[in-house]
Amino acid sequence: MSGNKTKLEQVGIANSYWGVCGFTSTFAALYQLNTGRKSLLHGGGVTTKVLAEIKTYLMTLKAEGQLGLLHEIQTFTRAFPPTAKGTDFSTFTIDGYIDRINLAVGKSDEDLKKEELHSIGMPPRAVVDYLNRMWQKKATLSLFETGANGIIGVRKDNRPMYGGLCHYMYRYGSKIYSWGQTFSSVKKANKEYSVILVISFS
């Protein structure tokens, strides 16, 4: 349930139980910029909406023969460390993920939230492509801290891919949005985080 959360916070709730920050941070940015299709971004059934949007993007990449991007997404997701519950991503496949989404049809939000394998890794290039391909937004990727509003990528350890990228968040003004919450700074969200990339668009 949304409780007392703002609509902008509601956009990111799915990331509080799945690793889907590449999508939810993008949704937050799109919502803040008053982009259309707002019914996708908040309200009831948000888990199902998020999964449907991810499936649509993956199916679009398959239909358009974007095998390189699909391989990057698959490889990045396989590099996820096991979760606290022991969920392992080392055998993740795009087709298996789509099948899992298909099996989610008709399940309750509460049941879906428990399934950590709905997580998926989005390399920076894939986030930029998603904005362009699915939302017709020309995004700019900067592999350093620019201080600009946008989707920020952070690191906290020595993960092997994309400069240690471990999470995406949305920054607007002096606020950071992630996991369905609002923070006054990146360090308030996690003191170990440091910004390593910014994806901006208008």
Task: List each model region and its residues.
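Active-site nucleophile-adjacent alpha helix/oxyanion-hole segment immediately C-terminal to the catalytic cysteine
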Residues: M1-I73
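Extended aliphatic helical segments
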Residues: V11, V20, V46, V50, ...
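Short, well-structured alpha-helical interface segments that form or flank functional binding sites
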Residues: S16, V20, T24, M122, ...
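Conserved active-site-adjacent core of cysteine acyl-enzyme catalytic domains
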Residues: T56-Y162, Y172-S174, W179, A189-Y193
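Short beta-strand-centered aromatic/proline hotspots
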Residues: H167-R171
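Conserved catalytic-core surface of thiol
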Residues: G180-S202
